[in-house]
Amino acid sequence: PLAPHVLYQLPKGQAIYPKAPTICYTLFESDRCPRPWIDALMAMDRILVFSRFNQESWSVTGIPPNKIGRLPVAIDSFLYSPEGPKMGIENSKGYVFLTSGDYTERKNFEALIEAYVKEFSDRDDVTLIVKAHYGGFTKRYRRECAKRLEDSVRIFNPKNPPRVLFWGDKVSDHAMAALYRSSDCFVLATRGEGLGMQFLEAAASGLPVIHTGWSAQADFLTPQNSFPVEYRLEWMDDPSYIVKCPQSLNS
């Protein structure tokens, strides 16, 4: 028999290997499968997702549960480990919080910045490192990301904000592993994850993890091994928010 054909992105038609079993390995960060995806997914012989969260997301959209399997992602536990080299973080002080990801509405950095700068001030011995990018890693995108971060800090604590450091460079996996080991806690107030790779890497590196208690990271982060934050689900029907976050639309 022909070997399965595993798809990581939607092909144009079924002409590549028309007789081979077709498996789609996919994810999404909301509680519904996007409607434009449904017909393509239904045409697959098998659908694999990273998390129970997406198993439920796909099922409630009408895809038969027996068509959906779960194949969690693996990480290099030798690289992402408490043991290994650290890095010197210039201008950091005291207890170091680390957050990372693309600076989008879904990652919800604004809520994290608000909580941090309202809880602490420049008198506290703490640092928040924001390892983020916004659209890319060029100088232009780094400037845009840094400006968004500065604006958020200024809005929520214009007088005496605690220390916030921004790192917008693209780095190697080894440098990222060293950054985890050089921090004291990983925190991200995400609105939704289909995978939650940063959480997995941080936890494997031995960091306490503060996270939203919903979506894919709930597969491996529990109240027993992390610090889940309470959340509230809302319908995304505000036009102004839809304009800011089009990638979250399901139709």
Tell where the protein language model's regions lie, with residue ranges.
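Aromatic "clamp/platform" in nucleotide-sugar-dependent glycosyltransferases that forms part
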Residues: 191
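Donor nucleotide-sugar binding/catalytic pocket of nucleotide-sugar-dependent glycosyltransferases
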Residues: 45-56, 64-82
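Nucleotide-activated donor-binding/catalytic signature segment of Leloir-type glycosyltransferases, i.e.
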Residues: 139-174
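Acidic anion/phosphate-binding donor-loop and adjacent secondary structure
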Residues: 35-36, 74-90
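Conserved donor-binding/catalytic core segment of Leloir-type glycosyltransferases
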Residues: 90-107, 113-116, 128-130
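Short alpha-helical donor nucleotide-sugar binding micro-motif in glycosyltransferases
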Residues: 177-183
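Extended catalytic core of nucleotide-activated donor transferases of GT-like folds
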Residues: 1-62, 175
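Short hydrophobic beta-strand element within catalytic cores of glycosyltransferases
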Residues: 208-211, 221, 227-229
